[in-house]
Structure formats: structure tokens, C-alpha cells
A protein has these predicted regions:
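Non-ligating segments of multi-cofactor redox enzymes
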Residues: 1-174
Length: 174
């Protein structure tokens, strides 16, 4: 599942799909807080969507994710999120987002192949608020930048255009 959050074009022209980052350190906070262990992690480190037969709809996973990725489907009473198209990637196929991306901004492959084909520095360390998270998803940054500080980038962008901080509301898939 790829989620694209609402974009208010009067404040921003950037778009980014909200992909699961498949956190590795700390190990998948969404899975750690699930009281019924509905969110499983594959041996390859892919954090799976909640198992429907186990999910009790407590939404702990939604609140625990530092990236705001899991969404709760009220109708299905189930958490939904990207599972890296595990049915495809476990068969050595690209996930649909990477397959469909016309500019290859979303790319799937191993680290060595990635660094041979791309310019910049691939990092998997992200600062989000006060938390630093290491993930299995890499971002390409300038060589001198060792981590992606999302909070600082958002504050910098808001300051440039004089935009107020957004109101935080819970997001639900309906």
C-alpha cells in the first residue's frame, strides 16, 4: 500500500508517498506495541501489515510509528500500511511503487547496485522529532549529509514561505 498524504499546494509543491520505512533500530515500534502480535517481521526485515485474524483494532501501532505510516481502516477495523509488496519482493520482483515510478525516484534493489547507479550518498538514518531511527529504506542525500533530519527540513521550508505549523489531526482511511 502506498499512501500519499493531502498536499496543500499553497504551502508546498513537494509530494512524497508515505512508505513504510521498515524500521530496524528501534525494531519496528509498531510491531513492538501490538498486544496480540498481529504485526510480524519477516526474516528479511519486512514489517508486515497487521494480520486480519489477530488485529483487535487498538491502534497502538498507528500511534507508535515515528513516521505516521500505519492508517486505521474504520470499515475493515484493521491497520493498513505498506508491506513492501512482500508477495512480489519475496519472488525477486520489484514492489509496485518502484515498478510504476516513471522517474525511478522510488528504486528497489541491493545497496551495492544502488550505489553503482546513483549519485549522492545513501543513508538509512532519519531524525524525526526527538527520535533517531535507522530503517531499511534509504534516501539519497548530498555526500556531506549523514542523516535525514525531517523535522529540520520541514521547519526550514515553513520558515522560507512563512507558513504556520500544521494542525495535527488523526488520519484515518475511510
Amino acid at each position: 500500500m502506498i499512501m500519499v498524504d493531502f498536499i496543500d499546494r499553497s504551502f508546498s509543491v513537494a509530494t512524497q508517498p508515505t512508505l513504510c520505512m521498515h524500521c530496524s533500530d528501534p525494531v519496528a515500534p509498531c510491531a513492538q506495541v501490538c498486544p496480540v502480535m498481529a504485526i510480524l517481521i519477516t526474516p528479511e526485515g519486512v514489517v508486515q501489515q497487521a494480520e486480519p485474524s489477530r488485529c483487535i483494532g487498538c491502534r497502538n501501532c498507528v500511534y507508535a510509528c515515528p513516521f505516521g505510516v500505519p492508517k486505521f481502516d474504520l470499515e475493515a477495523r484493521l491497520m493498513k500500511k505498506c508491506n513492501l509488496c512482500y508477495d512480489r519482493t519475496s519472488q525477486d520482483l520489484k514492489p509496485w511503487c518502484a515498478q510504476a515510478c516513471p522517474t525511478q525516484a522510488i528504486w528497489y534493489g541491493d545497496y551495492e547496485e544502488f550505489t553503482n547507479q546513483r549519485r549522492g550518498h545513501a543513508v538509512n538514518k532519519t531524525v524525526f522529532g526527538a527520535q533517531e531511527v535507522r530503517t531499511r529504506v534509504y534516501h539519497v542525500l548530498p555526500e556531506e549529509q549523514q542523516k535525514l533530519d525531517i523535522t529540520a527540513l520541514l521547519e526550514e521550508a515553513r520558515a522560507e514561505i512563512g507558513a504556520p505549523a500544521p494542525d495535527r489531526e488523526e488520519a484515518w482511511v475511510l
